[in-house]
């Protein structure tokens, strides 16, 4: 793009949604405020009487509201905050997804294990409300949606009638916020599967520039809290996490995904719960055909 808001002026949306602002892709910006400013450019192309839907829990909420008001947009906030127009009152994980309460809707069940995805669903509900569409049918349809491959899909390897391994495939991409969310959700899931061993497979988060080392090391405390039975890392930055934790957690590091692809089968056994999370460029998704082959082989042998 050559000019600010070039794309949004082509689209001329009636409703613009910003789900989050974080330090994702920060190597292309001077700081996080620049990221917030770049995202706020979507408001510049809004049609007259347009609506800006903004996450009320985000640190850049006030900045985004100010930018939206410059174009006289109607502000619609969504999130956990009490000031939200669409308020999340409860959001909890269970073994099969998430249960959410918002506004006057109680115990709505979604098939998304990742609470960030559930929060994004509430952003969609905010759009529906602004369009003044009936929500009942939409809620029924959304509750049937399943996570996509690489976006929190849950796969099960059945070894026999009593033993299985669960894989949470969040390998499509990662940034600092989504990585922390994935680890937090995995920790909640780990508590629900106490009898299972835990395996965390993480790849580097890319495009973080000079902040890369620090941001990766910020994951150390939550990984200590999860205390997985096995930590596998792919990339030079997650190797630094490995180096910090290898005295207390069983760890193996790989600089390239091709190395782990050759060895992954040796780590897979019954009664595990496994998380895959990393930037797309680290290639963790290349492990999924191996897992799916194991699923098929076991099904054929049953």
Q: Residue locations for each model-derived region?
A:
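Short, ordered loop/turn segments at secondary-structure junctions
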Residues: 21-23, 80, 205, 236-237
